[in-house]
Amino acid sequence: MQNRPLTIGLVAGETSGDILGAGLIRALKAQIPDARFVGVAGPLMQAEGCETWYEMEELAVMGVVEVLERLPRLLKIRKDLTRRFSDLAPDVFVGIDAPDFNITLEGRLKQRGIRTIHYVSPSVWAWRQKRVFKIGKATDLVLAFLPFEKAFYDRFNVPCRFIGHTMADAMPLQPDKLAARAKLGIAADARCLALLPGSRGAEVEMLSADFLKTAQLLRTRYPELELVVPLVNAKRREQFERIKAEVAPELRVHLLNGQGREAMIASDAALLASGTAALECMLAKCPMVVGYRMKPFTFWIAQRLVKTPYVSLPNLLAGREIVTELLQHDCVPDKLAASVMPLLEDSPQTDELKQTFLTLHQSIRCGADEQAAQAVLELAKA
């Protein structure tokens, strides 16, 4: 055992985890070139040299029905991984995101004396806060993207390290707006608004009509307003086009396949659903309004479960409302348009907002891959 190379177990459950895992492996190999990586890996992690025992897609299930259908298989995989990692006894096991799968696995491995890390904090600070106790028992360390996440874990004496956000590392502090416009075919002097009604089908269904009606109202004020709508895949594009044909068939918009980041950088303002898109928009230095609606019963439940004063990451990072959030009954075209309109004007307020975005960007731009690798190595030597 003493002569073997540093051995790291990893399990990633979806594409975002594969990206994080690949970055972590790269950073570890830069320090320990002969380290061995094994577990459940996507194509990017495999390209960096990680052996995989199962295809990552086996773990990538979404929605209650799909999870229930696949549950016997998922439980079988987790049992087998527990056995394999117990036999292998890696120096450290890193569960990358996929908390419903990984945290239980981490707990079982920790009971067997294997050091465990959970990479990417679940949103325990926002809802189902009691999960923090399970996480504390299951892991030796949580790696958190955001400083308020570490502050939350500190309250419960759960070891946590703030490593910064990989997206903040990937995006420049000063984005090139003119280059983004040239790429998307938008004139340098045009006034431009990005509409981002979400990446999930339910979000696109709930928000697209009101976002389009908002754009119509703004067009009466700014007749030459350019509208760009990046959609994550062909399914969401088809869905959006159907809604647009019903709600605003005459409205002129540029539909984009993906290219959400370019659209944000190119635009003067954005109207978007909450989620990671709001963080990305902040990093793009694009002033935004967050609009979000759920089914009434879901919203009723969320109001009782969610423990944070804001829903968008820019506001949570700032600790105050720097971005307008219009939720549920407030997410209507006249209110959305009234909030977006000032952002389309050059003003000291929008300049100040962009400066705040820059300050927040710098606060979470810490070299996350390298920080994560350092945490793994320190735990391996502990």
Swiss-Prot record:
Q: What EC class is this?
A: transferase
Matches recorded under Pfam families: LpxB (PF02684)
What Gene Ontology terms describe where this protein resides (cellular component)? membrane
User: Which pathway does this chain act in?
Assistant: Glycolipid biosynthesis; lipid IV(A) biosynthesis; lipid IV(A) from (3R)-3-hydroxytetradecanoyl-[acyl-carrier-protein] and UDP-N-acetyl-alpha-D-glucosamine: step 5/6
Catalytic activity field:
2-N,3-O-bis[(3R)-3-hydroxytetradecanoyl]-alpha-D-glucosaminyl 1-phosphate + UDP-2-N,3-O-bis[(3R)-3-hydroxytetradecanoyl]-alpha-D-glucosamine = lipid A disaccharide (E. coli) + UDP + H(+); a lipid X + a UDP-2-N,3-O-bis[(3R)-3-hydroxyacyl]-alpha-D-glucosamine = a lipid A disaccharide + UDP + H(+)
Quote the InterPro entries the UniProt record gives. Answer: Glyco_trans_19
Q: List the disulfide bonds.
A: none
Q: Kindly list the GO molecular function terms attached to this UniProt entry.
A: lipid-A-disaccharide synthase activity; phospholipid binding
Keyword list (alphabetical) reads:
Glycosyltransferase, Lipid A biosynthesis, Lipid biosynthesis, Lipid metabolism, Transferase
EC number, UniProt record = 2.4.1.182
Keyword Coiled coil in the entry? The reply is no
GO BP annotation list: lipid A biosynthetic process
Protein family (similarity comment) = Belongs to the LpxB family.
PANTHER family, from UniProt? LIPID-A-DISACCHARIDE SYNTHASE, LIPID-A-DISACCHARIDE SYNTHASE, MITOCHONDRIAL-RELATED
Q: Which NCBIfam families match?
A: lpxB
Query: What the protein does?
Result: Condensation of UDP-2,3-diacylglucosamine and 2,3-diacylglucosamine-1-phosphate to form lipid A disaccharide, a precursor of lipid A, a phosphorylated glycolipid that anchors the lipopolysaccharide to the outer membrane of the cell.
The identity of this protein, by name, is: Lipid-A-disaccharide synthase
Organism of provenance:
Serratia proteamaculans (strain 568)
What taxonomic classification does the UniProt entry list for its organism?
Answer: Bacteria, Pseudomonadati, Pseudomonadota, Gammaproteobacteria, Enterobacterales
